[in-house]
């Protein structure tokens, strides 16, 4: 298994609407297209949204993302996700134990 640690800096005043968008649309659609969401957090200042999503292999990332981003559900969201996010950091991480 391979995971992505994703850290989004959310635009000021938009965290509540981001969380609603994430939980009502983004998370279910990721999971529908085979991208597992392991956990999500908000930092103490409520400026960063941190989440982990997982794939079976590194090779699955590109294929699963292409399927997700071209889905009718994601297309219908338009630029809503991008309007919330000021900065994105993505790190590929692997478990240290089986």
Where is each model-derived feature located?
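Absolute protein N-terminus
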Residues: 1-2, 98
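Short, structured motif recognition centered on aromatic/hydrophobic residues
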Residues: 2-6, 18, 29-30, 49-52
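Short beta-strand-to-loop capping motifs
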Residues: 8-10, 53-57
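Hydrophobic small-molecule pocket/channel-lining residues, especially in calycin-type beta-barrels
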Residues: 11, 26, 72-77
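Short amphipathic alpha-helical segments
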Residues: 14-38
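Short amphipathic alpha-helices within nucleic acid-binding modules
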Residues: 16-18, 57-68
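Residues within well-ordered alpha-helical secondary structure of globular protein domains
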Residues: 21-24, 67-70, 80-83
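Glycine-rich beta-strand-turn "strand-cap" elements at beta-sheet edges
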Residues: 33-50, 56, 73-98
